[in-house]
């Protein structure tokens, strides 16, 4: 009964339930007079009047000053309750189809390629970008899909890191990537962590609503908010920021939502970017709701956020690759496809298979 629950905790950096005893109720909110603000003063801030990322007692918080996550009482309830979908989940053999990627370096067109979970390859103007590099089976997680290409064949120019949970930032992946001339674009205070995994990677840090300083590149990349949290070991909770990314290239926008709950930050992003061509949105790891709602979006919430962002094409992610929650592996995509069939999704929906090339 507890397998996926232990795996979820391991994926966020908790080796056992007992570690959670050290946490306060992580939903608690600070007061405005206890908040300090920080940002990378060397970067341009794209939101007028934005003071920087809020922090309370040296730890990052969300826009509403919450620390996100679920309190210990709810985690305990989850661990001691039966999963009502236990048998359905046990019998779910869903596996995302995989297309082999051979001759990746011969690709010339601009495109998006899904590698599973939150890892995407973006080929823009001859440069390769990789989001949230987790291409192995980290932190005792079993990966249910194979890779379409060996890690050693991924010649990446830029890594885009949304946050540091183990199912998004994998030490093995970072250490095995060919790192010559590779740059990591990361949240505030993540640089030291990345370089401890691979000292050859150049690191640039940004706060929310800040544009990375990229010389002679055909694209702009802006770091934006997400409603989430950070933890890899019990004592570093929220010491490193989390977020999402906007990529602007040749008149198109690609939004990578990272890991996030549904919150007001989507409207803030929409106010800066009138339309978004491609929205890469998380749809899985949402049950039970009383634990996951403060961390992740379910398919319906992801579509609501997509509408608020005025997105044109919805590309789902964060499902079917790892077992992180109580829902069956096939459920997130089934719910999303039902919304598409019902005409609920305003815009197009493209559920990529792993290794499938989407020209843009």
For each predicted feature, which ranges?
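Metallo-beta-lactamase
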Residues: 2, 7-137, 152, 187-256, 335-356, ...
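Catalytic core of the metallo-beta-lactamase
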Residues: 119-123, 214-277, 293, 297-301
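Divalent metal-coordination and catalytic microenvironments
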Residues: 122, 132, 163, 221, ...
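Active-site metal-binding motif and surrounding structural segment of the metallo-beta-lactamase
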Residues: 140-186, 202, 274-280
């Amino acid at each position: 009964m507890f397998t996926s629950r232990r795996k979820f905790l391991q994926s966020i950096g908790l080796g056992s339930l007992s570690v959670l005893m050290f946490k306060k109720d992580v939903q608690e909110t600070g007061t405005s007079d206890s908040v300090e603000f920080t940002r990378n003063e060397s970067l341009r801030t794209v939101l007028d009047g934005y003071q920087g990322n809020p922090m309370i007692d040296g730890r990052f918080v969300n826009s509403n000053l919450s620390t996100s996550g679920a309190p210990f009482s709810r985690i305990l309830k989850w661990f001691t309750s039966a999963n009502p979908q236990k048998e359905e989940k046990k019998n779910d053999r869903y596996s995302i189809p995989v297309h082999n990627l051979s001759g990746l370096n011969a690709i010339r067109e601009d495109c998006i390629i899904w590698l599973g979970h939150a890892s995407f390859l973006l080929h823009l103007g001859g440069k390769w970008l990789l989001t949230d590099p987790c291409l192995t089976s980290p932190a005792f997680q079993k990966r249910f899909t194979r890779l379409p290409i060996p890690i050693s064949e991924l010649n990446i120019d830029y890594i885009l890191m949304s946050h540091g949970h183990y199912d998004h930032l994998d030490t093995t992946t970072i250490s095995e990537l060919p790192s010559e001339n590779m740059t990591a674009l990361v949240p505030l205070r993540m640089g030291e962590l990345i370089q401890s995994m691979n000292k050859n990677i150049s690191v640039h840090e940004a706060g929310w609503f800040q544009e990375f300083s990229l010389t002679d590149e055909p694209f702009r990349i802006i770091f934006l908010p997400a409603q989430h949290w950070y933890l890899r070991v019990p004592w570093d909770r929220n010491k490193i920021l989390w977020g999402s990314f906007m990529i602007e290239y040749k008149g198109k926008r690609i939004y990578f939502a990272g890991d996030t709950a549904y919150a007001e930050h989507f409207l803030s992003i929409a106010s800066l970017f009138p339309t978004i061509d491609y929205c890469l949105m998380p749809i899985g790891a949402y049950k039970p709701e009383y634990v996951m709602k403060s961390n992740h979006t379910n398919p319906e919430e992801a579509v609501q956020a997509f509408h608020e962002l005025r997105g044109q094409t919805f590309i789902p992610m964060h499902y079917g690759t790892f077992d992180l929650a109580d829902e069956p592996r096939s459920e997130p995509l089934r719910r999303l496809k039902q919304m598409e069939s019902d005409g609920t999704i305003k815009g197009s929906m493209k559920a990529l298979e792993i290794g499938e090339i989407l020209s843009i």
